[in-house]
């Protein structure tokens, strides 16, 4: 690779992507900027209009496709603000025939709407680079009383609790995602010693889970605090 494995870079992700070799990554997961217009403690989530946001994402998505192996997959997490625009971009760049799933993550926590149904889910777009992609079927506990104690194939709606403020897993970074969410993705779309990449690393959950599951990784965030938190969490894996 044109970059080191098992390292977290503090830089513009487009610049890092341009340095990476073709066909060098097995799985990409990115919890992208949702374009909420909010300024969080750790980052500014404002890319302008949805169209301006897509102009910003497009060169990055093109590079992500280039570095992905033919057997690789990409998961992009967003919400209602960008999902429709992002789906069109991904259909154009990764091709409609390589769309696999739109996963709904139902998380439960959050505010309630006064003049709307409460918004309690994120969208995760799952695309492959080709039809020869890695996929390990995942199972979950059956909910029917008749099938109690049995397993069933996982569906595309994932009911996983978000991390509450008192949870041991919470590390104090805005929009931190739960490990269970990343375990499902990484187990399904990679094998041991594969390379996992995250170019919006944030709290570092994706890389921590990758390391716990015996995968190599490469991460990037433009925020130094995100990189520092991620490196600290990675150092604690296995201790």
Where are the model-predicted features located?
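Core catalytic lobe of class I
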Residues: 1-239
């Amino acid at each position: 690779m044109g970059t080191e494995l098992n390292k977290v870079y503090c830089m513009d992700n487009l610049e890092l992507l341009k340095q990476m070799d073709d066909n060098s990554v097995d799985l990409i997961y990115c919890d992208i900027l949702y374009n909420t217009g909010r300024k969080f403690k750790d980052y500014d989530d404002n890319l302008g209009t949805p169209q301006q946001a897509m102009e910003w994402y497009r060169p990055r998505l093109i590079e992500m496709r280039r570095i992905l192996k033919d057997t690789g997959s990409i998961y992009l997490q967003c919400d209602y603000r960008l999902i429709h625009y992002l789906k069109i971009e991904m259909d154009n760049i990764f091709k409609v025939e390589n769309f696999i799933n739109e996963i709904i993550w139902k998380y439960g926590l959050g505010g309630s709407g006064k003049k709307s149904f409460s918004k309690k889910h994120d969208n995760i777009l799952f695309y492959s680079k080709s039809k020869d992609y890695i996929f390990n079927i995942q199972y979950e506990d059956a909910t029917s009383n008749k099938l109690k104690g049995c397993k069933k194939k996982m569906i595309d709606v994932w009911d996983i609790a978000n991390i509450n403020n008192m949870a041991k897993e919470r590390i104090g970074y805005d929009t931190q995602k739960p490990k269970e969410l990343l375990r499902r993705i990484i187990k399904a779309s990679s094998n041991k010693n594969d390379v996992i990449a995250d170019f919006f690393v944030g709290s570092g959950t994706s890389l921590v889970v990758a390391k716990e599951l015996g995968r190599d990784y490469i991460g990037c965030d433009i925020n130094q605090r995100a990189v520092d938190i991620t490196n600290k969490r990675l150092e604690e894996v296995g201790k």
